[in-house]
Amino acid sequence: MMKGGIAGLMKQAQQMQENMKKMQDQLASVEVEGQSGAGMVKVLMTCKYDVRRVTIDDSVMDDKEMLEDLLAAAVNDAVRRVETTTQEKMAGFTSGLNLPPGMKLPF
């Protein structure tokens, strides 16, 4: 009886691993947009943290220091949006796992 329980747990763990891989593959194609300066700088990023596109309004091209700040802020905004989107999409998957508060998936 003990062997059956362990085998069941192993099968469940394998299914969970396969589902996690599928979710990660799906998240790789999800894109979010971070912005700063009321949309003067935009960063399009996948949920795998790959930057796909950076859009910069012509009006900020002459001020290098401001542009650097706006670019950093837009990237940080995109990263926060990736984390939020990932947590939302993983919520259903992780609901039965009893993870400690603040633990983020995928690891």
UniProtKB/Swiss-Prot annotation:
<dbReference type="InterPro" id="IPR036894">
    <property type="entry name" value="YbaB-like_sf"/>
</dbReference>
<comment type="function">
    <text>Binds to DNA and alters its conformation. May be involved in regulation of gene expression, nucleoid organization and DNA protection.</text>
</comment>
<keyword id="KW-0238">DNA-binding</keyword>
<comment type="subunit">
    <text>Homodimer.</text>
</comment>
<protein>
    <recommendedName>
        <fullName>Nucleoid-associated protein AZOSEA06390</fullName>
    </recommendedName>
</protein>
<dbReference type="GO" id="GO:0005829">
    <property type="term" value="C:cytosol"/>
</dbReference>
<dbReference type="GO" id="GO:0043590">
    <property type="term" value="C:bacterial nucleoid"/>
</dbReference>
<dbReference type="Pfam" id="PF02575">
    <property type="entry name" value="YbaB_DNA_bd"/>
</dbReference>
<dbReference type="GO" id="GO:0003677">
    <property type="term" value="F:DNA binding"/>
</dbReference>
<keyword id="KW-0963">Cytoplasm</keyword>
<dbReference type="InterPro" id="IPR004401">
    <property type="entry name" value="YbaB/EbfC"/>
</dbReference>
<comment type="similarity">
    <text>Belongs to the YbaB/EbfC family.</text>
</comment>
